[in-house]
Amino acid sequence: FFASNPDGRVPDYHTDLGIYEEGCGLDKVDMSWGHDEYIYHVAKDYLPEEAGYMLRYHSFYPAHLEGEYQYLMSDHDKEMFKWVREFSQYDLYSKSAERPDAEKLRPYYEDLIAEYFPPQLAW
């Protein structure tokens, strides 16, 4: 599938840095677009920056679980990634077999959402 892509024959693209400069920052790196990036763009204007990092990068496991791609991160990225690592313990494999009482929890989450988000979002 990738054999016909001419980028595969450019030696500079086959280095750790590729087209990027060391320490350029993850905001300068083209990454695949998925649900994490989508919800980040929906919520970024309403949440603290730390929460934005958690939303945007919580599925970037090579970086926050394995410590990969440090050479692309800015000092600010490295600082913010402590929040991504903190969040990861509540993300994958943290589900309980016991179903929560949605009606009991609803007021808490409605208040939390109202604290950060306007009544209507631009989806």
Task: Please place each PLM-identified region on the residue numbering.
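Divalent metal-dependent catalytic cores for phosphoryl transfer on phosphate-bearing substrates
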Residues: F1-E103
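Broad structural signal for hydrophobic residues in well-ordered alpha-helices, predominantly aliphatic
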Residues: A43, L112-I113
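Non-catalytic terminal regions of proteins
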Residues: S94, I113-W123
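Intrinsically disordered, low-complexity polar regions and short flexible loop motifs
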Residues: Y109
